[in-house]
Amino acid sequence: MIERLKIAKNRLEAMNSFNFPAQDRHERAPLLGSEYDHSMARQLSLLNVVGMTKSVLMSSYFNLMLVFVPIGLIAGWFEWNAKSVFILNMLAIIPLASLLSFATEQLSIISGPTLGALLNASFGNAIELIVGVLALKRGELRIVQSSLLGSILSNLLLVFGMCLVTTGIRREITTFNITVAQTMIAMLALSTATILIPATFHYSLPDNANSENALLHVSRGTAVIVLIVYVLLLVFQLKTHKHVCHDPSEVEEETEPRILGLRSSIAMLAIVTVFVSLCADYLVGSIDQLVEEVNISKTFVGLVILPVVGNAAEHVTAIVVSYRGQMDLALGVAIGSSIQIALFLAPFLVIVGWIISQPLTLYFESLETVILFVSVFLVNYLIQDGATHWLEGVQLLALYAIVVLAFFYYPQ
């Protein structure tokens, strides 16, 4: 037994003389390596998050305005005066809208062309949807209607007019897809009809409770029909006539580089939506006191201020692509957005109001109805030949200026 112990001792001394690690050190070596690997993985993950955050923040100059997000939330939480709450949260929504568009674009790149186009169509007017739902919950039906109409007019007249002027700076005549233009003309006509018919129906009935109830039923029935048409429009654009409605060269040239993964895009979309909802809630909640302090009408706030601010990032995009000569893209952003609001967002909010017992209708005041009809008529006339120039853009901008002037003096 003693001899065996001596032999084992000699072997251990021999191993140590050749710098072989002892058994206990050998067993600890993999554990130390594992801890090192985990530490490196955490550092790489942190660097990856920092890199993605930097890329997201540098994706648009509008992100410099993100500083207004916490300030706007603080102003709303501590109930500052209405003007401060409204202005700060209005400024906060601008970069949030840009981030929402960025997250949607990243998700669409991952999802593929068809599903990506559907995502862009669904989230294209997310700001108007969020503001509309929050205003609807508060019973601010006038804000909902005026913001919908204002978004349509700002896209048709202001944005499309600026696109025509911008592209006219570099080109004498600009052409675009005549098939897409004709389809949009038909959809704009249907959009106008969904507002003209309820207005005419209202004026043809006596002013009593039964008439209001009948108008509500007509609006809700119209909303269901129009939503079906909108779904069929998506099928037309994304499936059956995809080759006609989309220019592959323009889509390829305008595709953004992929920065975020699937989970990162979804997480960013969810987080930004939450912040938009918070800022929009404070924004809508301050309107009643704001119109009393500043002495302007709710119609002007909803029809002019909210649409321009909420779509600022999208408006800039349309102007930039039109300057590059990509008028089909500009047409899709400007007029396509108006069609989406009229055929999807407005009827969808009517259905939401139906569900939560808010009597939102598609009936607009006579001045608003006439202005929409004139605007759609002018745009239809300008795009029906598939070519345009800068003077036509000036005409659209002039009409928008007249509309703003009229609603500035519109009584409360």
UniProtKB/Swiss-Prot annotation:
Q: Please give the GO cellular component terms listed in this UniProt entry.
A: endoplasmic reticulum; endoplasmic reticulum membrane; fungal-type vacuole membrane
Give the way it sits in the membrane.
Multi-pass membrane protein
> What InterPro entries is this protein classified in?
CaH_exchang, CAX-like, NaCa_Exmemb, NCX_ion-bd_dom_sf
The reply on keyword Secreted is no
Which keywords does the record carry? Calcium, Calcium transport, Endoplasmic reticulum, Ion transport, Manganese, Membrane, Metal-binding, Transmembrane, Transmembrane helix, Transport, Vacuole
Offer one Pfam family short name for this entry.
Answer: Na_Ca_ex
Query: Which residue ranges does UniProt annotate as crossing the membrane?
Result: 56-76, 84-104, 115-135, 149-169, 178-198, 216-236, 265-285, 300-320, 335-355, 359-379, 390-410
The entry lists its GO molecular-function terms as: calcium:proton antiporter activity; metal ion binding
Provide Lumenal-side residue ranges.
77-83, 136-148, 199-215, 286-299, 356-358, 411-412
Give the GO biological process terms: calcium ion import into vacuole; calcium ion transmembrane transport; intracellular calcium ion homeostasis
Compartments, as annotated in UniProt? Vacuole membrane; Endoplasmic reticulum membrane
Q: Which residues lie on this side of the membrane: Cytoplasmic?
A: 1-55, 105-114, 170-177, 237-264, 321-334, 380-389
- NCBIfam families found in the cross-reference section: caca2, cax
Q: Which family does it belong to?
A: Belongs to the Ca(2+):cation antiporter (CaCA) (TC 2.A.19) family.
**Functional note:** Has a role in promoting intracellular calcium ion sequestration via the exchange of calcium ions for hydrogen ions across the vacuolar membrane. Involved also in manganese ion homeostasis via its uptake into the vacuole.
What is the protein's given name?
Vacuolar calcium ion transporter
